[in-house]
Amino acid sequence: MNIFYLSPDPRHAAQYHCDQHCSKMMIEYAQLMSAAHRMTESSHADSCYKLAHKNHPSTIWTRSSADHYSWLFELWRELSNEFYARRGKHHGSWTKLKDVLCYNPHLPLEGFTEPPQCMPDEYKVNGDAVTAYRNYYMGDKASFASWNW
């Protein structure tokens, strides 16, 4: 589980996702938002993915603030647009859950903080998750990352 916070702007962050993450992270982001619904007993919970990784830092971050959830939903929406632009079809998680996950599951209004840096320490940058995730992409993910679709 992770949230690739490659830009504070969800549209730009989605565009920066490599091809492999353009598909894989559609599922992970839907899982994170589904967990928020399930853990808050949202009326939409039964339509979501099953609860997974409830104590992962990214899951905790997603459900800790309505602003976090909203930002992640916008990233997921933009990543769906990016997936469609690259592949010419909609991702299955978008088709299945877009009408459910668009509802914020009554989370606290705690404001916005950057997502946790879930990566090896060598890439972390205190107080700057964007730079940390870009470092992580250029370092740890460079061996498979491509933008060919």
Give short role names for the model-derived ranges.
Residues 1-91:
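An N-terminal structural lobe/cap that precedes and organizes the functional/catalytic core
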Residues 103-149:
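Aromatic-residue-lined binding/catalytic grooves and analogous aromatic/hydrophobic interfacial grooves
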Residues 95-102:
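A glycine-rich phosphate-binding loop feature that marks nucleotide/adenosyl-phosphate handling sites
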Residues 60, 93, 146-148:
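Residues in intrinsically disordered, low-complexity segments of regulatory proteins
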